[in-house]
Design a protein with these regions (language model features):
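Histidine-acidic metal/acid-base catalytic patches
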Residues: 1-22, 86, 145, 161-365
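Short, conserved active-site loops that position catalytic residues or coordinate cofactors/metal ions
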Residues: 23-34, 64-70
Length: 365
């Protein structure tokens, strides 16, 4: 959750603040579940999952997905691949059922090289990547009483699948009804537009490359045009323009980690926070997703930031407030229509006009 770090800010407190600020749902980060298990349930993830579901039902919060099922596809160590499929995945299926969610998120693999030998531990072989992902999708289809969905997200620093175009190509090749894509404004712009290691904060051809990528995203006529039914949810978030390049002397630098990952972990922002340094073309991307493509569904504000590590309850409340302010601005700028269903928590759904029809989106952390 984007309100505070696990082990610093407890999950029940974050859920209460999310509800108070009118969020309808959450992406459940496994670290939050693990923290709750270790601190309150003698290490039992099962008991923690029941706890989270009961609390979310009381607060009228939906659990949209459990994430991240990471470091999975394209592993060169096929024994580790088998362990993930035969040992870890069944546990995640069980947790998902308890939590009441039907979706597991898989981020594209960014497993670093072997620390001892420097050898790569993943492959860019697209056939193997697709085969690995198709395998979990097929297992998800077999789940009872209903299938489990998987949503694939390209991270800007991943080893091989690091653009939305590559991610969409994989989703098409997997070709399973329960396997879709997550579009994230931060990761879309963070790869082709932003370069935190550059003095300008941008790649050499940032504007042209971003324009071309968005033209492909907007296109509805090409054979590779994105299928709206395959967009399982959307993340809308910005990034901070750093005052100095993120090099080895920068305080955000972590040896062995990709520069964009170090930036992401410390300097994401909610949309419309230009006063805090936001500079990515978030609105341009969002307009295409909501107005041109006509996306309907869950929208997440997935924030990672150094500010989430500040102790105290005010950190959680302030991030909940900032997220809500940001969302309200997005609603206004895109002309979304907000409506409040019954319920003391003030949860809401939002509609925007597209192609003459209502497009409903829902807000979450």
């Amino acid at each position: 959750m984007s309100l505070g770090r696990p082990w610093i800010h407890d999950l029940p407190g974050k859920l209460h603040e999310a509800a108070l600020y009118g969020y309808q749902g959450i992406e459940l980060f496994f670290d939050d579940l693990d923290c709750l298990a270790q601190t309150c349930h003698n290490g039992s993830h099962i008991e923690a999952a029941y706890h989270v579901r009961e609390l979310c039902e009381t607060l009228h919060l939906s659990i949209i997905c459990l994430q991240p099922f990471g470091f999975y596809e394209g592993l060169l160590d096929r024994n580790e691949h088998e362990r993930l499929v035969t040992e870890k995945l069944p546990r995640w299926f069980h947790l998902s059922r308890i939590l009441g969610t039907d979706m597991i998120q898989i981020p594209s693999n960014f497993l670093p090289a072997d620390p001892d030998t420097g050898a790569a531990r993943t492959t860019g072989d697209k056939d193997l990547i697709v085969s690995d992902l198709r395998r979990v999708a097929d297992l998800g289809l077999q789940q009872k009483p209903s299938p489990i969905r998987f949503v694939y997200e390209s991270l800007a620093w991943s080893n091989h699948i690091n653009t939305w175009e590559e991610c969409w190509d994989v989703v098409q090749r997997v070709d399973r009804p329960n396997f879709g894509i997550c579009l994230d404004t931060y990761n879309i712009a963070g790869r082709v537009y932003a370069d935190p290691a550059s003095p300008t904060g941008k790649t050499p051809n940032a504007d042209a490359d971003m324009h071309n990528s968005l033209a492909r995203l907007r296109s509805r006529t090409s054979n590779t045009a994105i299928n709206i039914s395959k967009i399982f949810y959307v993340q809308v978030v910005d990034g901070e323009r750093l005052s100095s390049p993120l090099d080895e002397n920068h305080p955000f630098h972590v040896p062995g980690q990709p520069t964009r990952m170090n930036w992401s972990r410390n300097a994401r922002l909610f949309p419309f926070e230009q006063d805090l340094g936001g500079y990515l073309p978030v609105l341009d991307i969002a307009k295409i997703i909501f107005n041109d493509i006509g996306f309907q569904g869950w929208v997440s504000l997935e924030l990672f930031s150094r500010t989430l590590a500040e102790p105290g309850p005010l950190t959680v409340r302030e991030h909940a407030r900032r997220g809500r302010v940001s969302w309200n601005k997005l609603v206004g700028v895109l002309g979304l229509r907000e409506s409040y269903p019954c319920g003391y928590l003030g949860g809401y759904s939002l509609s925007t006009w597209t192609s003459g029809a209502d497009s409903t989106v829902q807000h979450r952390l």
